[in-house]
């Protein structure tokens, strides 16, 4: 594995000396002649989370090199900075929260047209609470063989919230961004337990705290453990390694993984601006090819490469956390309370289960949650949800990259969805509340929730109307 000394990482195609290698490169060059790269030097952004792994692997294993790309990978301070830099063109593309480009399309926050042709990971998040909150939750949780029965539901928090309210204290929890997966998942868990996470009412009120019983606010992922340890928040939802970091530091307990909350949900995507994608179609496809190979490598042969992947991620220019902390979730296990380590082989999924394919239904689910909590503060037709998903998710580009890899002998047709794939997953009730999601009927889905907007309801003047 190549050692890098700087936060900005750069690599170029290696010139091979042997005649055989020269012949191979000449052949590759003739094949690529019809698809000349519009841009060879790229700068890609990420946030320090383990699910940025496909970017690190594509760099370290030379997959970007194979596509003729010179790539810099650069850590960003937070999701807003990252998103705005993609919009401005300072970054060619980036690791993004799955709902982030959808927020751009609907105009919640920065208005922008971002597209995604690659899902970077399924699952990979958890909800962690402070030791004090855990101490109060634990007596209400069923036990088996001396350990808590999972999944743990949010209704165990209700007596604690009542106590905080009686004492005049807010119950503060953190997520990473308003139009982010962690916000949607934390809200889902709380509401499934009968706890209101609050409404948005844009453009007047974008706090998301209207009517909230638990107060949610933004904290950048690497700052989550320290912010909780300081007492500013009592819990958070974030990706790894920042839940396992709380376990290792002895400051908190992850109470539920998102795999238990909603199985195999799209967590991160790779996003570029639509203008960039339109201007650089061949370069875009080349990037997706490299990322597909990286995701295949990460999930190959029952995760046999994960230890090497963890070594990459532990380097300071990537995630920079201790090897043991990252390995705790990347290698098919997950530690809840200290010493309570359990098998969770699909905590991080990069390729299996068609994990890297950009399903419209994943986008539609996130849009339903934006509507549920008022980020979309008006009723929309079922057709609108699919139309909006198609503005962002581009399975056509993904499959073009996949077919190129198949033609090159780097993948098999059976590795990918068939040509008949619609981009809509079958209805599923793999959620903590058992409510089935059918992406073809988003409004009917929303009407199933006890907490949240439905039908023609809107939030006005701090109240739900309609």
Regions found by a protein language model. Give the residues of each.
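Internal, well-ordered alpha-helical segments in soluble enzyme and binding-protein domains
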Residues: 182-185, 220, 224, 242, ...
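C-terminal segment of classical bacterial N-terminal signal peptides
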Residues: 22-32
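Secondary-structure end/capping motifs
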Residues: 279-397
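Short glycine- and hydrophobic/aromatic-rich loop-to-beta-strand nucleating segment
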Residues: 127-128, 269-272, 276-277
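Soluble non-cytosolic domains of exported or imported proteins
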Residues: 49, 76-80, 95, 177-181, ...
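Bacterial N-terminal signal peptides that target proteins for export
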Residues: 2-17
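Short, glycine-/small- and polar/acidic-enriched structural segments
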Residues: 34-217, 227-230, 234-264
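Conserved C-terminal helix/tail region of periplasmic/extracytoplasmic solute-binding proteins
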Residues: 364-466
């Amino acid at each position: 594995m190549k050692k890098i000394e700087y936060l900005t990482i750069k690599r170029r195609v290696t010139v091979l000396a042997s005649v055989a290698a020269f012949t191979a490169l000449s052949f590759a060059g003739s094949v690529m002649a019809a698809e000349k790269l519009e841009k060879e030097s790229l700068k890609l952004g990420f946030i320090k989370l383990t699910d940025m792994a496909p970017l690190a692997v594509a760099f370290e294993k030379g997959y970007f090199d194979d596509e003729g790309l010179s790539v810099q990978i650069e850590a960003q301070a937070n999701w807003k900075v990252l998103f705005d830099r993609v919009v401005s063109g300072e970054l060619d593309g980036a690791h993004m929260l799955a709902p982030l480009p959808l927020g751009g399309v609907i105009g919640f926050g920065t208005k922008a047209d971002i597209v995604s042709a690659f899902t970077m990971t399924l699952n990979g998040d958890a909800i962690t609470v402070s030791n004090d909150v855990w101490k109060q939750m634990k007596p209400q949780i069923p036990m088996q063989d001396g350990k808590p029965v999972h999944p743990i539901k949010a209704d165990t928090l209700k007596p604690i919230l009542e106590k905080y309210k009686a004492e005049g204290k807010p119950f503060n929890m953190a997520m990473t961004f308003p139009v982010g997966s962690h916000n949607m998942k934390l809200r889902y868990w709380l509401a499934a337990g009968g706890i209101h996470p609050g409404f948005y009412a844009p453009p007047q009120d974008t706090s998301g705290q209207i009517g909230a019983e638990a107060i949610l606010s933004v904290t950048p992922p690497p700052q989550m453990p320290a912010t909780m340890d300081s007492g500013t928040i009592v819990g958070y939802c974030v990706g790894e390694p920042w839940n396992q970091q709380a376990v290792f530091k002895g400051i908190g307990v992850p109470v539920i993984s998102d795999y238990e909350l909603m199985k195999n949900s799209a967590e991160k995507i790779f996003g570029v601006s639509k203008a960039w994608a339109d201007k650089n179609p061949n370069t875009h496809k080349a990037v997706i090819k490299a990322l597909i190979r990286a995701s295949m490598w990460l999930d190959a042969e029952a995760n046999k490469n994960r230890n090497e992947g963890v070594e990459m991620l532990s380097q300071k220019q990537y995630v920079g956390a201790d090897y043991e902390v990252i390995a705790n979730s990347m290698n098919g296990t997950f530690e809840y309370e200290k010493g309570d380590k359990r098998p969770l082989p699909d905590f991080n999924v990069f390729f299996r289960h068609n994990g890297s394919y950009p399903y419209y239904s994943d986008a539609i689910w996130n849009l339903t949650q934006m509507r549920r909590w008022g980020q979309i503060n008006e009723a929309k037709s079922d057709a609108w949800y699919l139309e909006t998903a198609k503005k962002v998710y581009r399975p056509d580009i993904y499959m073009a990259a996949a077919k190129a890899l198949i033609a090159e002998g780097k993948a098999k047709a059976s590795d990918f969805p068939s040509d008949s794939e619609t981009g809509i997953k079958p209805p599923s009730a793999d959620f903590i509340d058992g409510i089935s999601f059918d992406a073809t009927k988003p409004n009917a889905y929303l009407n199933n929730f006890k907490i949240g907007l439905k039908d023609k309801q809107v939030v006005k003047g701090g109240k739900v109307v309609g």
